[in-house]
Amino acid sequence: AKEYHIDGFRFDLMGIHDIETMNRIREELSKIDPTIFIYGEGWLAADSPLPPGKRAVRDHVGQMEGIAVFCDDFRDAVRGSTFDEHACGYASGNIGGHYEPVKFGIVGATQHPQVDYNGLLYSSVPYAAAPSQAVNFVASHDGYTVIDKLRLSVTGDRAEEELLPIDKLIHTVLLTAQGVPFIRAGEEMMQDKQGEPNSFRSPDAVNRIDWTLKAEHRGLFDYVRQLIALRKAHPAFRIPTAEGLRQ
């Protein structure tokens, strides 16, 4: 942060760290630059020797001011389950069971009277003390890209022509929700990974950004660009406090 002026840090499997350590990291980085962004995966890959109450997991992020976590409820509700490649999500017509998790992401994982927290996919509580503690996303380096996921889950005679409007709806929900929107590089132009969900083991031919897609899918690219401009222009999409959201 001092030598290279890095302005953000992401923690893989942040749940293996303890709350006290994460808060200390936040404290020390804030001395250098209080705008440095800290976020991570609010879960574990396996069991941990840490007592459950001390783990820096999603449901404890309210105890870690200035630290954010990925909102996986939002991801799987909007685009379909990560654990079932053929499952559709809210944007592709599978509204049942996904309505509340979508609303949960829209309010930035905060407490809101219009969200039924019993209807969430993975979380059970409104864990974010402020919307800035929830990172809403629909794709990351792990798992399928949006377009790969849609090609697996959207079927039927009109499947191919439905992909673009579904992709647009996914990004509309993402970029108009409260919280911090996270966009994997290339999603704005339908970048795929040739159907590979774990591309860490794949060559550059799979992981590289294919810039020819920007021209091929210029309509989606411009649409996402305009959504970003809309979000930046209107404070209503960036309400900083949970109380402000409830009002």
Predicted regions: what they are:
Residues 10-13, 124, 154-164, 210-218:
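Active-site rim elements
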Residues 247:
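Carbohydrate-binding surface patches
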Residues 1-17:
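Active-site groove signature of glycoside hydrolases
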Residues 26-28, 35-185, 189-192, 200, ...:
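Conserved alpha/beta catalytic core and glycan-binding cleft of carbohydrate-active enzymes
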Residues 200-210:
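Acyl/amide activation-and-transfer machinery of modular secondary-metabolite enzymes
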Residues 3, 20-32:
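Alpha-helical structural signal in soluble globular domains
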Residues 212-241:
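Catalytic cores of secreted or luminal carbohydrate-active enzymes
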Residues 1, 21, 166-173, 178, ...:
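Alpha-helical packing segments of well-folded alpha/beta enzyme cores
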